[in-house]
Amino acid sequence: KFIQEVLWRTYWKGWLELRPNVWNDYLIELKKIREDFKDNKEYLNAIEGKTNIECFNYWVNELKENNYLHNHTRMWFASIWIFTLELPWQLGAEFFMQHLYDGDAASNTLGWRWVAGIQTQGKHYLASEWNIKKFTNNRFQKIKLNENAPPKISEKSYTIIKQNFNNPQDLNEKNLIIFENNLSFEITDFKENIFKKIYII
């Protein structure tokens, strides 16, 4: 599972690298939303762990104290934030980045977009009471969630911005070393080459 999550993180880095305007738009939207919600009671209660959802409050405090949440918990947290508390996903993504020791701009931003339903249009993630109780051994009781919320809608689309790779050398039968922050294989620069070995670092 750990290796799977590392690979997802690497994939998201490559995905965002090809679509830098997703990040640019997020920063622009966040700046405006942050100002709009600076005195919003629901938002302030959420970041202080003072909502009427027991498990969410516990996770807020856990995040602040330990600077970490389990991956499944992060999904529950984001879903509750977006669909039950009805707060902007941009603020939730910022809250995670402020506290997570392992926070990564690409996987965090795109993960929140995925939960909301705008990363894969029309497909969102909804946390449910039974799922939370099952995987927390019925630890929490007050779990009243919006389990029928529709996905968020975004009219924006992003084209791939690709930088050409120029190398005059013959790369066939050579070894290729790829670093995690440059793993963009949706459109590969090396599709015409046959490598002896490929190393991912």
Model-predicted regions and their roles:
Residues 1-72, 79-201:
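C-terminal catalytic domain of photolyase/cryptochrome flavoproteins
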